[in-house]
């Protein structure tokens, strides 16, 4: 069905995405690349614009202040460029940050990652975008691993992992799932259900 929650109240992939894109304070990215300019595989060569344009929307009644961090990375998550923007968004408003051009970098082997932090340094939102269709991106094996520690599932990655899926049982609800990782470690809270066994996979495994 098209529902994001099944008959028993269990979360499907869409519901985890909905939790993110309906966040009261949201960071999102409008990327320019192949899919926004020309999807014809037989097209004559042309100058492809590759850019990222971050937006922060604030649907709360309070002013939001924080920092938007960004990085341009390779498939192994190593950094090519990085930086940040100070962000102030009035209540019930949205702010566009400066557009960034990456036309001089590779189309199939670079990706753009972004993260929004509040004044206390807490992660409010994050994500990543590609400049080509995912099936054409040169993903590297992120060497994902996951294990249970107390009330958390700890996920580790050695490279870029897109749409990381934690499988921990049909009745388990987590604080996050189907997320992107720039390598490193991420702790995901077990909100409901009992975890007997845990496995993890990403877009890399769709082959």
Predicted regions located by residue number:
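Carbohydrate-binding surfaces of carbohydrate-active enzymes
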Residues: 1-175, 181-191, 197
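Generic C-terminus detector
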Residues: 195-207
């Amino acid at each position: 069905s098209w529902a994001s929650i099944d008959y028993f109240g269990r979360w499907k992939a869409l519901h985890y995405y909905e939790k993110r894109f309906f966040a009261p304070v949201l960071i999102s990215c409008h990327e320019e690349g192949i899919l926004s300019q020309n999807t014809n595989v037989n097209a004559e060569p042309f100058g492809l614009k590759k850019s990222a344009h971050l937006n922060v929307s604030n649907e709360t009644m309070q002013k939001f202040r924080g920092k938007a961090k960004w990085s341009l990375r390779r498939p192994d998550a190593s950094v090519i460029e990085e930086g940040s923007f100070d962000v102030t968004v009035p209540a019930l408003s949205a702010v566009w940050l400066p557009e960034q051009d990456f036309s001089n970098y590779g189309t199939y082997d670079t990706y753009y990652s972004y993260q929004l932090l509040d004044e206390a340094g807490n992660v409010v939102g994050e994500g990543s975008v590609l400049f080509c269709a995912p099936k054409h991106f040169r993903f590297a094996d992120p060497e994902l691993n996951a294990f249970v520690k107390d009330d958390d599932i700890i996920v580790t990655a050695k490279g870029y992992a897109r749409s990381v899926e934690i499988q921990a049982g049909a009745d388990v609800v987590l604080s996050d799932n189907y997320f992107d990782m720039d390598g490193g470690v991420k702790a995901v809270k077990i909100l409901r259900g009992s975890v007997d066994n845990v496995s993890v996979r990403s877009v890399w495994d769709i082959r």
